[in-house]
């Protein structure tokens, strides 16, 4: 997120013609990118990891192509997505991380994170896996309650868990729906 803050500050300054230290901001953004790209990569897992030095996957990595930190076609990203699919995705639902490998200080098991599931759909869209993205999106719609609302998490039996309704999840839903619609419309034109 540090990279996103600097990147968006640069974009905003350029768009609005605000004065800024061009060299310093761009150098800072580049340093952050290189640190994440090289030091948050695990060769053995072939994936970006939860934090520097860890060996744990984290579904928050799904934000990387969504915030344009990395191309959805970058080889490291494709490998990360495969690793997330293998370890954190069950059906259409995505766990934030593996509770058995990461001690978050919270007792008990976690459900799958609804927001991460919508990020996953959007990553599939941006990576060109439109049919899979559409299928997973439609399955996710089935987890909403009778009013179309989502909780923070979904349990193993499909029950809504955690904060309800959760705004972040609905933002993920809207973003995934928008991206899926845009990509499907563009595919029709080809």
Predicted regions and their residues:
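Alpha-solenoid helical repeat scaffolds
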Residues: 12-15, 130, 143, 183
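C-terminal substrate/ligand-recognition segments
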Residues: 109-129, 170
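Long hydrophobic alpha-helical segments that form multi-pass transmembrane helix bundles
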Residues: 6, 23-26, 30, 36
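Extended glycan-interaction surfaces of carbohydrate-active proteins
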Residues: 30-113, 135-165, 171-185, 189-190
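Inter-helical turn/loop segments and adjacent helix faces that build the functional surface
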Residues: 9-26
């Amino acid at each position: 997120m540090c990279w996103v803050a600097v990147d968006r500050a640069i974009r905003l300054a350029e768009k609005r013609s605000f004065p800024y230290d061009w060299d310093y901001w761009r150098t800072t953004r580049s340093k952050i990118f290189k640190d994440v790209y090289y030091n948050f990569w695990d060769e053995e897992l072939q994936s970006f990891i939860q934090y520097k030095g860890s060996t744990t996957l984290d579904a928050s990595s799904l934000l990387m192509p969504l915030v344009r930190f990395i191309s959805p076609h970058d080889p490291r990203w494709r490998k990360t997505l495969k690793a997330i699919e293998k370890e954190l995705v069950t059906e259409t639902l995505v766990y934030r991380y593996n509770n058995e490998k990461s001690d978050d200080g919270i007792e008990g098991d976690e459900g799958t994170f609804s927001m991460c599931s919508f990020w996953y759909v959007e990553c599939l869209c941006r990576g060109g896996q439109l049919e899979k993205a559409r299928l997973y999106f439609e399955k996710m719609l089935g987890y909403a309650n009778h009013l179309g609302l989502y909780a923070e998490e979904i349990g193993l039996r499909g029950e809504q868990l955690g904060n309800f309704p959760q705004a972040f999840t609905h933002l993920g839903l809207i973003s995934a729906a928008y991206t899926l619609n845009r990509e499907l419309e563009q595919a029709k034109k080809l």
